[in-house]
Amino acid sequence: MSDTAVADTRRLNSKPQDLTDAYGPPSNFLEIDIFNPQTVGVGRARFTTYEVRMRTNLPIFKLKESCVRRRYSDFEWLKNELERDSKIVVPPLPGKALKRQLPFRGDEGIFEESFIEERRQGLEQFINKIAGHPLAQNERCLHMFLQEEAIDRNYVPGKVRQ
């Protein structure tokens, strides 16, 4: 081994790792889970909501933990706001499942458990991809989506300042 390779290796091992370093909280983290789907309403006014729980230590977020209820149309709103105002490429949402909404189906359509679970997983992937993007983390609409009980659809778009 060359002298520079040995010196580089020595430099990596300069500080021994203790249990706090190994098992303590990561320096920066952002965890978002979507869970507990609930179908509410009847007939044409029936829809499914999901709990969106966020935990973070990123200083850009005013709350370190939040839990809000969102429906699919709220995710559509967020996607449209980000596409309109930000410079990031917004991933697609899970599909609308138009065929599942046709009347006189033999199953529950969009209210079938397997479909709700599939959509929940897709929404969780969607929100984690967006929230993990450094530019999206500055968008006011993302903060409102994750941390406000109600979404103010008349808000003024902009960046969040630390």
Swiss-Prot record:
A cellular component annotation (GO) from this entry: early endosome
Domain PX: 28-152
Locations listed in the record: Membrane
Modified residues (Phosphoserine): 73
List of residues that carry N-acetylserine: 2
Molecular-function GO terms, alphabetical: enzyme binding; phosphatidylinositol binding; phosphatidylinositol-3-phosphate binding
GO BP term, example: negative regulation of protein processing
Superkingdom per UniProt: Eukaryota
Membership in a protein family: Belongs to the sorting nexin family.
Entry remark concerning the domains of this protein: The PX domain mediates interaction with membranes enriched in phosphatidylinositol 3-phosphate.
Protein's name in the database: Sorting nexin-12
Gene label: SNX12
